[in-house]
């Protein structure tokens, strides 16, 4: 996609942390491009949601500042909270970019902040979580966002699953790809744990636009302002706006989706066999 805005003159601190796992080999420019792209999407959300200012910002997971450095350069006035399970990353963001450090928790229900946020950026988090943790994360994001606040998070959908189905190499090799694709075609949500994650639950999650839209119906206070396919690398971008009581709670309470995803009609037409080349 073309750049949405020109941030070429923005004074971004390009200092890289020695232990930043997102920078490898000759991928430094891609690292900065993804950070800049995130800021473009965040600025787009401010226009879309009529939010010219974001005084309180949460970057979760912040890593070593791939996106946060751009937030600091553009929103110099903002209080930016850096949160991650990687404590070295949190410490680096605090020391280098003046962020407020908060160490995350594996169970986000155990994570508490002293204030709500005007903007929450969540890049590539729910893309690694199973169904229950995915929904828990969304519950927490809504809870942590103040009235008229914005949530932006990324997902993996049709682009990512198409690459897997077509046998594209160097996308993801350490999961059960046929099982992931079959479940995705059947329900719109699928998760497979990484082969090496023997003592944890961390892997790849994929979600369809339809599944996400249905899931968001649990939240009468949340408006989906945008769903942008392939807007952050191969990941989709979702922009949500919080407004209390905007919709009638006609479809239940947040617990309604605490069950296995509902099968879709796709299986009736042999779509799974076609997708997997059988």
Which stretches of residues belong to each language-model region?
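Local beta-strand N-terminus motif with an aromatic residue
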Residues: 54, 117-118
């Amino acid at each position: 996609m073309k750049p949405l805005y020109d941030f070429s003159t923005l004074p971004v601190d390009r200092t890289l942390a020695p232990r930043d796992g997102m920078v490898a080999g000759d991928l430094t420019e891609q690292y900065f491009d993804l950070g800049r792209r995130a800021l473009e999407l965040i600025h787009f959300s401010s226009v879309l949601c009529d939010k010219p200012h974001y005084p309180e910002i949460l970057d979760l997971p912040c890593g070593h500042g791939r996106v946060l450095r751009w937030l600091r350069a553009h929103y110099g006035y903002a209080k930016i909270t850096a949160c991650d399970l990687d404590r070295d990353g949190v410490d680096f963001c605090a020391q280098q970019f003046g962020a407020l450090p908060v160490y995350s928790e594996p169970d986000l229900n155990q994570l508490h902040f002293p204030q709500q946020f005007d903007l929450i950026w969540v890049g590539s988090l729910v893309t690694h979580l199973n169904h229950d943790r995915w929904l828990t994360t969304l519950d927490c994001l809504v809870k942590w966002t103040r009235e008229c606040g914005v949530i932006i998070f990324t997902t993996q959908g049709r682009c990512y699953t198409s690459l897997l189905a077509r046998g594209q190499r160097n996308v993801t090799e350490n999961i059960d790809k046929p099982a992931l694709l079959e479940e995705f075609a059947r329900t719109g949500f699928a998760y497979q744990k990484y082969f090496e994650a023997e003592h944890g639950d961390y892997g790849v999650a994929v979600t369809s636009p339809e599944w996400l839209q249905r899931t968001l119906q649990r939240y009468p206070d949340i408006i989906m302002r945008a769903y942008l396919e392939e807007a952050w690398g191969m990941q989709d971008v979702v922009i949500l706006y919080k407004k209390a009581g905007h919709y009638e709670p006609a479809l239940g309470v947040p617990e309604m989706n605490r069950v296995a995803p509902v099968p879709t009609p796709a299986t009736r037409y042999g779509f799974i066999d076609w997708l997997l080349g059988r």
